[in-house]
């Protein structure tokens, strides 16, 4: 039987490239920067333009599909997550990087049916790296097959995470104490590139052994989540329970043993779910 979603995925790759071109062009020009939920949560006109282009292109081709987009939600739309084929879009993952011209900026497109991730496309456009993952078909970067590391020993692991955009003292305390706890196990190190999607793709490549974060959103995870799984990795909730795309938290790891070991160390940040906002 023909893959019903392959055409959608091929289209997502074309659109991600177009969006990347818009972003690269915008990097040459002066930017108007606005603030969203905190002084460290930024948005630009380019975020909004790219999302508009992606949404209108997809809606024209697939009018009966559903959509969740970061900038649409920021402008007041509800996150409605149903069984319908749903495109989950982050037009610029790494807006702060974009504003500072720090070279990790990604377009993330996830596609979910019956609440299951079917495919993901993450285009790291400054690096010109196109990451793709299709349920049951593997994960690739620029056509090269991806495979997670086989590292199960946390003391030999390299982790990726972020400080996040919240500047609330209690949230920062938890974020930093979690890092301190993990570092003192000890582990080899912690890295951050400033975009959840690229952090997760680095786990898929085997370059990092695991990624964890709390406070991100479904549009940060939907594209890269399936890429990690298809590269042989696992997704887990930070409690060690099953991963939930609407929960705003994740451990993406090369294997279950490492994911569960990380979960043991984490103090949980209380968060409002995406589907409750």
Curated annotation (Swiss-Prot):
Keywords: Cytoplasm, Hydrolase, Lithium, Magnesium, Metal-binding
InterPro entries for this protein: IMPase, Inositol_monoP_metal-BS, Inositol_monoPase_Li-sen, Inositol_monophosphatase-like, Inositol_monophosphatase_CS
Superkingdom: Eukaryota
Reported cofactor(s): Mg(2+)
One MF annotation (Gene Ontology) recorded for this entry: lithium ion binding
Record-level GO cellular component terms: axon; cytoplasm; neuronal cell body
Catalytic activity: a myo-inositol phosphate + H2O = myo-inositol + phosphate; 1D-myo-inositol 1-phosphate + H2O = myo-inositol + phosphate; 1D-myo-inositol 2-phosphate + H2O = myo-inositol + phosphate; 1D-myo-inositol 3-phosphate + H2O = myo-inositol + phosphate
Binding residues annotated for substrate, in chain numbering: 70, 92-95, 194-196, 213, 220
Residues binding Mg(2+) 2, per UniProt: 90, 93, 220
Localization of this protein: Cytoplasm
Sequence positions that bind Mg(2+) 1: 70, 90, 92
Pathway(s) of this molecule: Polyol metabolism; myo-inositol biosynthesis; myo-inositol from D-glucose 6-phosphate: step 2/2
Enzyme class: hydrolase
UniProt-listed Enzyme Commission number(s): 3.1.3.25, 3.1.3.94
A matching Pfam family: Inositol_P
One GO BP annotation of this record: signal transduction
Expression by tissue: Ubiquitous.
Known regulation of activity: Activity with myo-inositol monophosphate and D-galactose 1-phosphate is inhibited by Li(+), Ca(2+) and Mn(2+), but also by Mg(2+) at concentrations above 3 mM.
Family: Belongs to the inositol monophosphatase superfamily.
Annotated function: Phosphatase involved in the dephosphorylation of myo-inositol monophosphate to generate myo-inositol. Is also able to dephosphorylate scyllo-inositol-phosphate, myo-inositol 1,4-diphosphate, scyllo-inositol-1,3-diphosphate and scyllo-inositol-1,4-diphosphate. Also dephosphorylates in vitro other sugar-phosphates including D-galactose-1-phosphate, glucose-1-phosphate, glucose-6-phosphate, fructose-1-phosphate, beta-glycerophosphate and 2'-AMP.
Self-association state and partner proteins as the record states: Homodimer.
Descriptive protein name: Inositol monophosphatase 1
The species this protein was found in: Rattus norvegicus
Lineage summary: Eukaryota, Metazoa, Chordata, Craniata, Vertebrata
């Amino acid at each position: 039987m023909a893959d019903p979603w392959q055409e959608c995925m091929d289209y997502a790759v074309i659109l991600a490239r177009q969006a990347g071109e818009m972003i690269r062009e915008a990097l040459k020009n002066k930017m108007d920067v606005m603030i969203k939920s905190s002084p460290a949560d930024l948005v630009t006109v380019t975020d909004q333009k790219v999302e508009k282009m992606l949404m209108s292109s997809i809606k024209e081709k697939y009018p009966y599909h559903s959509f969740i987009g970061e900038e649409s939600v920021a402008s007041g739309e509800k996150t409605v997550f149903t069984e319908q084929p749903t495109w989950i879009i982050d037009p610029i993952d790494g807006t702060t990087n974009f504003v500072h011209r720090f070279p990790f900026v990604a377009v993330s497109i996830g596609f979910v049916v019956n609440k299951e991730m079917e495919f993901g496309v993450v285009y790291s456009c400054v690096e010109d790296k196109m990451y793709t993952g299709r349920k049951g078909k593997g994960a690739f970067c620029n056509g090269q097959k991806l495979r997670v590391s086989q590292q199960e020993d946390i003391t030999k692991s390299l982790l990726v995470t972020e400080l996040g955009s919240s500047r609330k003292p209690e949230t920062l305390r938890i974020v930093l104490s979690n890092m301190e706890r993990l570092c003192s196990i000890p582990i080899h190190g912690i890295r951050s590139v400033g975009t959840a999607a690229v952090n997760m793709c680095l786990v898929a490549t085997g370059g990092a052994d695991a990624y964890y974060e709390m406070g991100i959103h479904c549009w940060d995870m939907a594209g890269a989540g399936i890429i990690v799984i298809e590269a042989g990795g696992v997704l887990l909730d930070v409690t060690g329970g099953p991963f939930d795309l609407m929960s705003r938290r994740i451990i993406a790891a090369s294997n279950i043993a490492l994911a569960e070991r990380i979960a043991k160390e984490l103090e949980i940040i209380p968060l409002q779910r995406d589907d409750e906002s």
